[in-house]
Curated annotation (Swiss-Prot):
<keyword id="KW-0699">rRNA-binding</keyword>
<dbReference type="GO" id="GO:0070180">
    <property type="term" value="F:large ribosomal subunit rRNA binding"/>
</dbReference>
<dbReference type="GO" id="GO:0003735">
    <property type="term" value="F:structural constituent of ribosome"/>
</dbReference>
<keyword id="KW-0687">Ribonucleoprotein</keyword>
<comment type="subunit">
    <text>Part of the 50S ribosomal subunit. Forms a cluster with proteins L3 and L19. In the 70S ribosome, L14 and L19 interact and together make contacts with the 16S rRNA in bridges B5 and B8.</text>
</comment>
<dbReference type="InterPro" id="IPR019972">
    <property type="entry name" value="Ribosomal_uL14_CS"/>
</dbReference>
<comment type="function">
    <text>Binds to 23S rRNA. Forms part of two intersubunit bridges in the 70S ribosome.</text>
</comment>
<keyword id="KW-0689">Ribosomal protein</keyword>
<dbReference type="InterPro" id="IPR000218">
    <property type="entry name" value="Ribosomal_uL14"/>
</dbReference>
<dbReference type="InterPro" id="IPR036853">
    <property type="entry name" value="Ribosomal_uL14_sf"/>
</dbReference>
<keyword id="KW-0694">RNA-binding</keyword>
<dbReference type="GO" id="GO:0006412">
    <property type="term" value="P:translation"/>
</dbReference>
<dbReference type="Pfam" id="PF00238">
    <property type="entry name" value="Ribosomal_L14"/>
</dbReference>
<dbReference type="InterPro" id="IPR005745">
    <property type="entry name" value="Ribosomal_uL14_bac-type"/>
</dbReference>
<comment type="similarity">
    <text>Belongs to the universal ribosomal protein uL14 family.</text>
</comment>
<dbReference type="GO" id="GO:0022625">
    <property type="term" value="C:cytosolic large ribosomal subunit"/>
</dbReference>
<protein>
    <recommendedName>
        <fullName>Large ribosomal subunit protein uL14</fullName>
    </recommendedName>
</protein>
Amino acid sequence: MIQQESRLKVADNSGAREILTIKVLGGSGRKFAGVGDMIVATVKQAIPGGNVKKGDVIKAVIVRTVSDVRRADGSYINFDENAAVIVKDDKSPVGTRIFGPVARELRDNDYMRIVSLAPEVL
């Protein structure tokens, strides 16, 4: 589960390396976010020449979490790290590549562009 002040790895080539969660979007007083949820974050580490700079306030969608995600068939999936992809307001990614696997739950939340760019969907 991702909450305010959580730090996440960025799984795309937008130029950011690490982000810090400012707010979980979707409802008043919502505390936690899981795979497929949108967050507002700030860039904490960035590489030179990237599309985003350190200190930028961005929106991102969570693609991997360490905590378990329960599926409809009763199975669970988790990952080794918490990771997100920086997106625009229309849910399209800022970067042109996605690194690492992403969860299948993104397909249910209409992030088809992220799913199509990902090398593996679990």
